[in-house]
C-alpha cells in the first residue's frame, strides 16, 4: 500500500477528496444528457451544484473547491452525487468514481486506509492507479 503514496488513484467512492483546492469526479453517461453534480460537506449541507453537458461514454468534472457563492472550501472529504437528465426529461443517477492523490497509509485494526490529504478512504475501494 505504501507504493501508492504520491500516485493519483481512481477510487470507487461517493466521497470526493478536495486536495489543494481541487476535486475530480469521473462519470459515465449512456448518451448525451445534462449532468447535475451535487456536492455536500460532512454536515450534509449543500456546498456546490454544477450542471454540465455529458456525452456518451466517459466524462470528467473538476471541482475548483468553491461553493455556490464562490468561497473557497477547506480541503477534506465531501460527498458527491450525479443525476443525469435526458432531453426527454428522464432522470437517473449516473455511475461515477473519484480521483485523488495518495498522501499516506494508515491501519485501524485490520482495515488499511489510504490518506488523500485530509480524506481517508478504504484501500479496497481503489480501482486503478492513474499515474
Kindly give the residue locations of the regions a language model identified.
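Type III/flagellar secretion export determinants
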Residues: 1-131
Amino acid at each position: 500500500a505504501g507504493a501508492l503514496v504520491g500516485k493519483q488513484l481512481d477510487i470507487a467512492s461517493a466521497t470526493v477528496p478536495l486536495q489543494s483546492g481541487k476535486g475530480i469526479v469521473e462519470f459515465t453517461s449512456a448518451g448525451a444528457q445534462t449532468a447535475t453534480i451535487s456536492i455536500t460537506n460532512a454536515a450534509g449541507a449543500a456546498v456546490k451544484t454544477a450542471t454540465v453537458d455529458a456525452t456518451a461514454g466517459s466524462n470528467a468534472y473538476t471541482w475548483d473547491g468553491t461553493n455556490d457563492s464562490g468561497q473557497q472550501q477547506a480541503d477534506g472529504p465531501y460527498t458527491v452525487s450525479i443525476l443525469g437528465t435526458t432531453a426527454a426529461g428522464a432522470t437517473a443517477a449516473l455511475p461515477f468514481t473519484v480521483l485523488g492523490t495518495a498522501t499516506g497509509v494508515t491501519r485501524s485494526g485490520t482495515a488499511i486506509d489510504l490518506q488523500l490529504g485530509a480524506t481517508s478512504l478504504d484501500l479496497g475501494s481503489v480501482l486503478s492507479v492513474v499515474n
